[in-house]
């Protein structure tokens, strides 16, 4: 439930329902895996969420598969048949039990919207991981036809959507990381949306670098800097520090604090977030989280954007097959008064 103050006297209330139902089949002694319903394709990260069927055949060093389905409505995530897509992939990687783990995936995806050309593209993904170094690279190349070729000045091929990340570990206590993201559009499906996740999504595009580490048995820390451009917020710079602790007490108490300073072309401000979680018993865990964002406009025409949020997240396992998750969140300030409630029930068989 979202309740927003449209003016000083009235409220406008919206109710949204998001569903996700899927079933999959796979066995450790069978190379075939099949999924049906609303799902992500594990080897087709470029596709994001879709409603349809996915199948893959995976051997020790290679895999191949494909999908066919439709895209959900972008605004309310209901089922829609407007955008239909299909595609396939081939993956080749390291031998089993190798110390250096790597894989290269290539494939093609084609989609139409109400029978007309939507998007056709080729893609390549690569990942590498060993004891010290890990990296990921994804590149898409649009194959333009019809109106898309005219929109791209007659070019048949256009390189789009580059994403790269690199991480190097200096032992267990220190690591450095860097990345680059110029993807034009990323459809993100989240079970829970908070001002913290919205902030990170808004400033997603750009380059970043950071360092993180571990002090002692329980303390975790991190610092990073990001320069964003091309996204909905325009050009912006942000600096983030995080501090956390895990494995405290016999109940597995954990805590995390995050603070971000940001400056864009139109606003500047701070974002602070805190979460604390603990096991209530061997089969259930509770998290309390919240935060505050203070934003000051750089132009008089833009209103101030101070607001806060807080909530609870409870998970419980029932037997070997059932997982229940309940979340309640409240956002207030900056002309908003929003309540969000989520319930998820999973059954593994």
Label each region the model flagged.
Residues 1-349:
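Gram-negative and organellar
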């Amino acid at each position: 439930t979202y309740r927003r103050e449209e003016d000083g006297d009235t409220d406008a209330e919206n109710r949204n329902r998001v569903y996700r139902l899927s079933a999959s089949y796979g066995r450790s002694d069978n190379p075939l895996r099949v999924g049906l319903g609303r799902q992500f394709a594990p080897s087709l990260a470029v596709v994001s969420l879709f409603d349809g069927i996915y199948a893959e055949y995976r051997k020790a060093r290679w895999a191949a598969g494909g999908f066919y389905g439709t895209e959900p409505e972008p605004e309310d995530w209901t089922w829609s048949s407007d955008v239909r897509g299909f595609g396939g992939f081939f993956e080749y990687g390291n031998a089993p039990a190798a110390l250096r783990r790597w894989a290269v995936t290539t494939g093609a995806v084609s989609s139409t919207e109400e029978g007309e050309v939507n998007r056709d593209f080729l893609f390549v993904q690569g990942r590498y991981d060993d004891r010290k170094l890990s990296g990921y690279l994804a590149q898409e190349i649009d194959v333009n036809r019809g109106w898309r070729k005219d929109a791209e000045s007659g070019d048949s091929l256009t390189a789009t959507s580059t994403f790269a990340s690199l991480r190097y570990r200096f032992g267990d206590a220190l690591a450095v990381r860097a990345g680059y993201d110029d993807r034009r559009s990323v459809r993100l499906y989240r079970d829970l949306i908070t001002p913290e996740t919205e902030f990170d999504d808004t400033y997603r595009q750009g380059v970043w670098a950071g360092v993180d580490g571990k002090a002692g048995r329980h303390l975790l820390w991190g610092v990073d800097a990001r320069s964003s451009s091309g996204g909905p917020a325009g050009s912006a710079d942000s600096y983030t520090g995080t501090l956390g602790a895990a494995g405290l007490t016999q109940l597995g108490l954990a805590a995390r604090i995050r603070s971000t300073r940001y400056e864009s072309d139109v606003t500047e401000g701070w974002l602070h977030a805190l979460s604390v979680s603990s096991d209530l018993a061997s089969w259930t865990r509770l998290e309390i989280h919240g935060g505050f964002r203070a934003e000051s406009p750089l132009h008089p025409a833009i209103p101030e954007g101070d607001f806060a949020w807080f909530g609870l997240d409870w998970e419980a396992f029932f037997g070997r097959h059932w997982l229940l998750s309940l979340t309640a969140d409240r956002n207030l300030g900056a002309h908003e008064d929003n309540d969000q409630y989520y319930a998820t029930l999973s059954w593994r068989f």
